[in-house]
Amino acid sequence: MRSNPADYQFIAPGSLQAVISLLGEEPGAWLPIAGGTDVMVQYAAGKLPARKLVSIWNLPELQHIEVSADEIRIGAGCTYTDLRKHDIVQREFSLLARAAAWTGGIANQNRGTLGGNIVNASPAADSLPALLAYEAELILVSVRGERRLSYRDFHTGYKKTKLAPDELIQAICLTRQFTAHLAYTRKVGARNAQAISKVCIAAIGRMAGGVIEDVRIALGSVAPVPLRLGETERLLKGKSLRPSLITLARKTAAEEIRPIDDIRSTAKYRAAVVANLVAEFIQILDAHGALDMSQVLARWNGLPLEDAANEILPCCGSQGWAHRMAAQRPFLDVTALLAASDETWSNLTAADWMEAFRSHPRIGESLPAQSAPASSDSSLAKTWSEQEQRKVAASGEDLRIAMAKANQEYEQRFGHIFIVCATGKSAPEILEILRRRLRHDEDTELREAAEQQRQITRIRMGKWLST
């Protein structure tokens, strides 16, 4: 049922203190409205939770971004455009900057606010896992004064929070302690832009001496609230990376979440995606180690276009991908680089994908199935392929024969070689995957092969940055 505008009262005080006083006079009666991106949706459905609306849009006390030596303090009224364009947010809190760029379209980013996203309490909100990973603190204000609350403790259930009826979020505080961490984020949705997440991940980690010194992994759309994977983090911290640890981390992460079946996805799919994303993050973290990526990126950012494209070509094998990546420089950090790689790859043509596929050897062989792209450093690509297929190369003769037979059947059916991210997978696992994928139709299999190539490219980029 639609609502009647005459049933609502709307006022716009000129100061934060006036808003706080109003909320204190009638706790729970007034609904603060910032950018109002959800107002018309709720209004049209007759689901606005209050009849009295008070505007907090454009209040100067809520729109600042203050930077000190120890922390950055983001006003709750700052928009996603403010966040994605802010220099310190981009350089030191890239997970949040990337999430801001994912949130809706440009119009939504110009109006939507970080504080509003937090209070709206959607478990699918893109920015909230980043706040969990960075261990944000909220500053809450009311007529009773000010209090700080860890963001991790803010959500108590689906669409439920610890915000009192007379309180507002004034600011979000992030400590500046993660500049040495690798940042990893990914959003899985029905399309590349303006889509509600099926799963989103924000993770940071730091290696020291081959051991995971620190790790924080947060997820959205997999539980009634945004979720930190505490058990998975405890499993990984202090450990060196082994295939068995990655396998156990995949299992632990999938068991730690509480996904549901809904209009966007299924619980089973979400669990599988979470396992894959956690494994990918760990592999990239391991490949990067303790390297200072800024030096590698700074050098590559300054190369001529052709030289830059040729240098990263072995990571993927597609000239289209390599040249588009080189044309997007400079990249501020590895998170931005990897995000651009994913987006560039997804927007290539099927012909570009096939070019990348042809640069790989068949599973169980050492030479590319067809000639590698021109200008590719084939020796580097060959070395990486051997590393990726190490377990297959060590398998028995019977299994290699079965793999060769399945490869032939696959190529006859789909017209290109079988592509799988083989890192950490045993030969029997790969053969089982190959046989399962033989049941796909051509379009489904092409997209699955492209997804596997995306994962391979990410891992190889980590190795390239480590050279």
What are the functions of these language-model segments?
Residues 1-293:
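C-terminal structural segment of proteins
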Residues 16, 93, 243-246, 305, ...:
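Residues at or immediately preceding the N-termini of alpha-helices
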Residues 76, 224-228, 300-304, 315-318, ...:
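Short acidic alpha-helix initiation/capping motifs at coil-to-helix transition points
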Residues 275-280, 284, 343, 416, ...:
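Short, residue-level hotspots on alpha-helical faces of the histone-fold
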Residues 294-315, 320-406, 456-467:
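Aromatic-anchored, charged helix-turn/loop surface patch used as a conserved interaction hotspot
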Residues 392-467:
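C-terminal non-catalytic interaction appendages of large macromolecular assemblies
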